[in-house]
């Protein structure tokens, strides 16, 4: 089974232009993501998908593989699908290019269900919410699943909405696991054929309302397997986030 991890990387990021090439301990951020992804035991190969020659040059400079894509893509999924269409892979993994601390074990956790069950078309990850701030934040995507681990819904709103427990919504309730809530981790695994099909689907009502592409899958009647992980990473959307990454690395020595 051939499993390809693709890292979409744009240069023209609105909040942090050129972040893929931001230096972290002497390496561009995209190199950190690439090298960590390559350490996942289930990944056969890693490719950076980008629309900028500067990123292509940086990736090739450290010996990585990069593919140029159209500049007209509106989403990372579209960029992913363009590269996937050129490949003969069985499974495609979408690894976010702005998570330089991603743990290779997270990637393997997400891949395992599809590698073991050929009926599964798509998978992703979730991790426990540990603070009231994250539970209420629209920037933290929440997910609820059924008893078998399939996604029921993703939302930027508090999910579930504890109708009779708002007085219990304190940090301690989350850290003690009195309230069991999960945030979505944006790492996706697709059967290649399904990814290409997904990219051709029209945007859906709930997807546009929440600005969450994965809802397109649910609205079209398909299932998403969601695996719980204990690993957490830091997404770099701003220079301030980059400072957090540098602090984390400093603490690790």
From Swiss-Prot:
<dbReference type="GO" id="GO:0005829">
    <property type="term" value="C:cytosol"/>
</dbReference>
<dbReference type="GO" id="GO:0009103">
    <property type="term" value="P:lipopolysaccharide biosynthetic process"/>
</dbReference>
<dbReference type="InterPro" id="IPR004528">
    <property type="entry name" value="KdsB"/>
</dbReference>
<dbReference type="GO" id="GO:0008690">
    <property type="term" value="F:3-deoxy-manno-octulosonate cytidylyltransferase activity"/>
</dbReference>
<keyword id="KW-0808">Transferase</keyword>
<protein>
    <recommendedName>
        <fullName>3-deoxy-manno-octulosonate cytidylyltransferase</fullName>
        <ecNumber>2.7.7.38</ecNumber>
    </recommendedName>
</protein>
<comment type="similarity">
    <text>Belongs to the KdsB family.</text>
</comment>
<dbReference type="InterPro" id="IPR003329">
    <property type="entry name" value="Cytidylyl_trans"/>
</dbReference>
<dbReference type="InterPro" id="IPR029044">
    <property type="entry name" value="Nucleotide-diphossugar_trans"/>
</dbReference>
<keyword id="KW-0448">Lipopolysaccharide biosynthesis</keyword>
<comment type="function">
    <text>Activates KDO (a required 8-carbon sugar) for incorporation into bacterial lipopolysaccharide in Gram-negative bacteria.</text>
</comment>
<comment type="pathway">
    <text>Bacterial outer membrane biogenesis; lipopolysaccharide biosynthesis.</text>
</comment>
<dbReference type="Pfam" id="PF02348">
    <property type="entry name" value="CTP_transf_3"/>
</dbReference>
<keyword id="KW-0963">Cytoplasm</keyword>
<comment type="pathway">
    <text>Nucleotide-sugar biosynthesis; CMP-3-deoxy-D-manno-octulosonate biosynthesis; CMP-3-deoxy-D-manno-octulosonate from 3-deoxy-D-manno-octulosonate and CTP: step 1/1.</text>
</comment>
<keyword id="KW-0548">Nucleotidyltransferase</keyword>
<dbReference type="GO" id="GO:0033468">
    <property type="term" value="P:CMP-keto-3-deoxy-D-manno-octulosonic acid biosynthetic process"/>
</dbReference>
């Amino acid at each position: 089974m051939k499993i390809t991890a693709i890292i979409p990387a744009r240069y023209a990021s609105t909040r942090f232009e050129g972040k893929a090439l931001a230096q972290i301990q002497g390496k561009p951020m995209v190199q950190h993501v690439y090298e960590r992804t390559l350490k996942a035991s289930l990944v056969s190969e890693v490719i950076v998908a980008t629309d900028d020659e500067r990123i292509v040059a940086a990736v090739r400079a450290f010996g990585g593989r990069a593919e140029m894509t159209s500049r007209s893509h509106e989403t990372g999924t579209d960029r992913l699908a363009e590269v996937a269409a050129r490949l003969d892979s069985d499974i495609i993994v979408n690894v976010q290019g702005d998570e330089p601390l991603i743990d290779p074990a997270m990637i393997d956790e997400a891949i395992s269900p599809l590698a073991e069950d050929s009926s599964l078309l798509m998978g992703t990850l979730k991790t426990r919410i540990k603070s009231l701030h994250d539970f209420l934040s629209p920037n933290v995507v929440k997910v609820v699943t059924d008893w078998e681990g399939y996604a029921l819904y993703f939302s930027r709103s508090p999910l579930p909405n504890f109708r009779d427990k708002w007085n219990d919504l304190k940090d301690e309730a989350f850290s003690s696991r009195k309230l069991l809530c999960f945030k979505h981790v944006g790492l996706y695994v697709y059967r290649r054929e399904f990814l290409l099909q997904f990219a051709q689907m029209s945007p859906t009502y709930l997807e546009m309302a929440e600005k969450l592409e994965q809802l397109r899958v649910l609205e079209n009647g398909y299932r998403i397997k969601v695996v719980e992980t204990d690993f957490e990473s830091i997404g770099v959307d701003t220079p301030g986030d980059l400072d957090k990454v540098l602090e984390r690395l400093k603490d690790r020595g």
